[in-house]
Amino acid sequence: MLAPLLLLLLAVPLWQAAELRLGLRGSPRGTVSPAFLSLTLDASLAREPRFITLLSNPKLHTLARGLSPGFLRFGGTSTDFLIFDPHKDSTLEEKILSELQADFSQPGFAAVQELLLAQWPGQEKLLLTEHSRKKHKNTTITGHTLDILHGFANCSGFHLVFGLNALLRRHGREWDSSNAGQLLGYCARRGYNLSWELGNEPNSFKKKSGIYIDGSQLGRDFIHLRRLLSQHPLYRHAKLYGPDVGQPRKHTQRLLRSSAAADSAEQKHYFYADHLSSPNLTSRLFLPLPHDTAQIVAATVPGKKVWLGETSSAYGGGAPQLSNTYLAGFMWLDKLGLAARQGIDVVMRQVFFGAGSYHLVDASFEPLPDYWLSLLYKRLVGTRVLEASVAGADARRLRVYLHCTNPQHPKYREGDVTLFALNLYNVSQSLQLPKQLWSKQVDQYLLLPHGKESILSRRVQLNGRLLQMVDKETLPTLHEAALAPGSALGLPAFSYGFYVIRNAKAIACI
């Protein structure tokens, strides 16, 4: 089913070396949040709450810490089917984990996790089947569920954004906040510093549950939630994010106007395709991100930021044999570049770990190509966005983006810039730096697929070295390859990589 995609990539002409045009002298094009690349956990992970305990795995903590700081959004369709019951008994697995953690005996939980991992494929199949059939059931979560979620986020260097159930209604209209009040009370008593959302994709409520809620009503519900938060000193100034929409609808403006006093950022959910690797995927691989949401927000509530609150290569769990391969990295890296260029403040990757094919970490806690790509992005790319373009090549097939280098990186200094580039040609391409940079040292971080599967590989190498964890608590060193001053930047066919230009003296980066 991927054949049309591969044919599209191959059917391109040979072009000569491209000349880079880099905006080093002016002001930055824009600035994004330090948490620009953030993560999600789908609420379906709590569909059977005992599987939440998988988040206690130390290897998963190590992998998450590598991508911090950021937001960790716990949301998705299942958000609106979660019921909090402070009196319900926790699952056996949650109780065991709690007791072992109290005794500082984390290794003792390993046997329980092995059993859960053996049962996970069946649970994953159930979740994907329910999603495809649009059959959603209420799930009860307990205080232990919240403890594990908050503990995972906190220990990994992330700020948890928790989605509250918006489908609890009085007479099908006004939001019933009683359950949310219980959940907020529990979190406040535990001292959990969280941010909040209300509902997931309200534009699809009718399809999911048969309940239609117009934008004005949902806006009033946001105001209601803000008042509820204000009853707790800990949450008086907590961030409330939303609304998050799958597609802009006519009621979006009404919702924004009604909730303007409550929300901190409007969220857009964006995927390139559905979960099937259909021929239509070829024409949708590199579509520009939609401007309509940003335009609506700017016109309705100026100053509010826009997030991509849930995004990946394909919705519905991802596209099998695509979303978890090197090939998906083209879509992910390009989306990061486009989003920053278009002023999106935060991009939340669906998902870090969970059901489907679009996760960054698989069911064996092994990092996939998009994880390593995300790790490099976090290490090398800063928040200031600069201008970049190419001359002498088709910009749709040779894509370049430029940022100030991450100032937290120990090897780099103010004035350094990070270029990341994607080559969709079937031949190698060379990028020529502007003449004023020919004397500068450039560090290359070239990502290529590893193994005979080529671009459909689930393993990746950096500058020729296979990327893999040293052990469950240690990420590998990301070794650069220093290029000789004046060298062209080489990109093999169907590849992507990062290039740090040292001492570029970019004015916006000083």
Model-found features: residue ranges?
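Non-catalytic accessory regions flanking glycosidase/transglycosidase catalytic cores in CAZymes
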Residues: 2-264, 291, 297-309, 313-510
